């Protein structure tokens, strides 16, 4: 299978499973990713997702150009229908407010980096390499790279990476805020799982509302963002979890949240 979908408790791990092709996204993988993200989004028992790549070499090298070119390139607008949901389903058009963790086990290039940019927190192996290299092949980032990267790192650095098509190391990615942590390769998935465990101990509805507030707020004036934050905060007050949290605090015990 081009994709592995595994669930342990409330944590889903989605693994790009084409290590022989640096986990590049071919049409089959693209379709399976759309199905996987839809399944994760709609499953009430799935609270956090981890996305990673099989093998030790690559998270993902992006679109498999050999297999994607016939349907995505060659004439103006050729790739529009193919990209309605964006590469892998999450780069455009699918809103997922549940948190997603990227466990970057190697190269994250072109569309692979764009997939990573859709994740909320990112841990990278020490040998990982990052880049939006599309201009080398006379194409441009088309799965959100030109929009998300400048929102995460200094604009000058985003310009450098995109216009020159150059790569950067894991250490540089951490320095500029592109990843949250850099760890030895053997610790990438354990770190992602530890983070997922921490998030699962928090109020799941509150976590989702907070993520939604952050993402939507990035494109809003501050006053509008504050109104949206107040609205989302208000929607939590009538939930069972919002009763359980303060009650557990008062009783000096660990809360038991049910996403209700």
Regions found by a protein language model. Give the residues of each.
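Short, active-site-adjacent cap segments at secondary-structure transitions
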Residues: 56-60, 109
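Conserved CoA-thioester-binding segment of acyl-CoA-metabolizing enzymes
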Residues: 1-56, 70-74
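Crotonase-fold acyl-CoA enzyme core
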Residues: 91-207, 230-231, 235-247, 251-253, ...
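Short, charged, surface-exposed hinge/linker loops at domain edges
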Residues: 211-220
């Amino acid at each position: 299978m081009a994709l592995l979908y595994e669930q342990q408790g409330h944590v889903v791990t989605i693994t790009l499973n084409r290590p022989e092709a640096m986990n590049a996204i071919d049409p089959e993988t693209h379709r399976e990713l759309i199905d996987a993200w839809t399944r994760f989004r709609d499953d009430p028992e799935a609270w956090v997702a981890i996305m990673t790549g099989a093998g030790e070499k690559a998270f993902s090298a992006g679109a498999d150009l050999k297999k994607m070119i016939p349907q995505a390139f060659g004439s103006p607008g050729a790739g529009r229908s193919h990209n309605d949901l964006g590469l892998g389903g999450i780069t455009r058009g699918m809103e997922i407010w549940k948190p997603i963790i990227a466990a970057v086990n190697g190269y994250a290039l072109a569309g692979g980096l764009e997939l990573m940019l859709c994740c909320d927190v990112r841990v990278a192996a020490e040998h990982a390499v990052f880049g939006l290299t599309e201009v080398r092949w006379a194409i441009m980032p088309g799965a959100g790279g030109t929009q998300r990267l400048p929102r995460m790192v200094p604009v000058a650095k985003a310009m450098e990476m995109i216009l020159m098509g150059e790569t950067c190391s894991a250490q540089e990615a951490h320095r500029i805020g592109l990843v949250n942590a850099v760890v030895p390769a053997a610790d990438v998935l354990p770190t992602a799982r530890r983070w997922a465990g921490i998030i699962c101990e928090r109020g799941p509805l509150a976590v989702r509302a907070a993520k939604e507030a952050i993402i939507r707020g990035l494109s809003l004036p501050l006053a509008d963002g504050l109104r949206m934050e107040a609205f989302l905060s208000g929607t939590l007050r009538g939930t069972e979890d919002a009763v359980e949290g303060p009650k557990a605090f008062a009783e000096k015990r660990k809360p038991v949240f049910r996403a209700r």
